[in-house]
Amino acid sequence: MRIKFPAGNYSLVGEPLTAEKPKAPFNRVAFAAAHVVADPFGNADPTGAPAVDWQRTLAYRTHLLDLGFGIAEAMDTSQRGMGLDWPTALELIRQSLDHAGSRAGQIYSGVGTDHLAAADARSIDDVVRAYHEQLHAVQKLGGRVILMASRALVRVANSPADYENVYARVLAEAEHPVVLHWLGEMFDPALKGYWGTENFPSAMETALQMIDANKAHVDGIKISLLDAHKEILMRRKLPGGVKMYTGDDFNYPDLIAGDHLGYSHALLGIFDAIAPVASAAFTALSRGEMNKYNALMAPTVPLSRLIFGAPTQFYKTGIVFLAWLNGHQDHFIMINSAQALRPLPYFIEVFKLADQAQLLRDPELAVLRMKQMLAIHGA
């Protein structure tokens, strides 16, 4: 099968991988951060509350759960803080938990301070109150928690001790151990200097001290710094029983596979896009079939590096584009009109790399939709 691109013809080479439900649990905890499907017929201004297609949004979560993944709900991949406001995020969490039924325990939801504009934060007490408001709301629904980084905390904190103070007070209210999230500035520039410094070793030590002081309330930490060395260094320093969840969408296969000193679990946005292949790879890893694991994962890395390439915060556009190509939604419209945040050559390369990674589940449909994308660009 061929498609004509502006730079020439491209012949598809990938054999679509059939998605199969795992027959046994993975030997790693694996969360997929899931995207939200916009309602293209909703009368929503891009600067206001988003219009969500709840049916398709929930169906995609079922797709991910069926492939063996937990769901990281209402996180960055869902455009949290970049189009998805807190009231809509809470409704998403409620509906997702209800829809999952007996599998609701596999859903961990983002708790942050995004309803408090950073410019309106005056003290760390303001930040603690904001965290508590969201924490209590999610726990009231019976939800487990991922404690997200706070733009407001960056604004008001004067020292690493302020971070330790805030996290200790918030974690004290957690009903179950939470997953912490250290999101790097490449994902959100407003988080530059998190933990009170731009020096990584110092920031890491502050985070480790906070975790050690509150480890009864901490299941693990996800770090999204796109640096394998930093993740491994911190992983080896974590207190016993506290998990490292890789958030590294550039280096995840090796970090998950691990070494003689340990391995990372996973909480990744790229799993939204590569779920069928990643699920098969986790099954192979669980069986000790390392050659198969590497053969499946390796072709997904160039795709992930492209999708998450700078400016990284716009990676959601590539994630949703693939969901559209694969027929999980009928349109390529995003909340906050984020479908416009990448250029045509990016989409062409995403198409090619997805094909090469066996991720176009219906090549004929994918080609048809890629042609539609080309047409609206005048190609």
What label would you give each PLM region?
Residues 2-201, 337-341, 345, 357-379:
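Active-site beta->alpha loop and helix N-cap motifs at the rims of alpha/beta catalytic domains
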Residues 255-379:
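Structured C-terminal cap/extension of enzyme domains
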Residues 58-59, 99-102, 135, 173-176, ...:
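Short, surface-exposed, polar/charged, turn-prone segments marking secondary-structure boundaries
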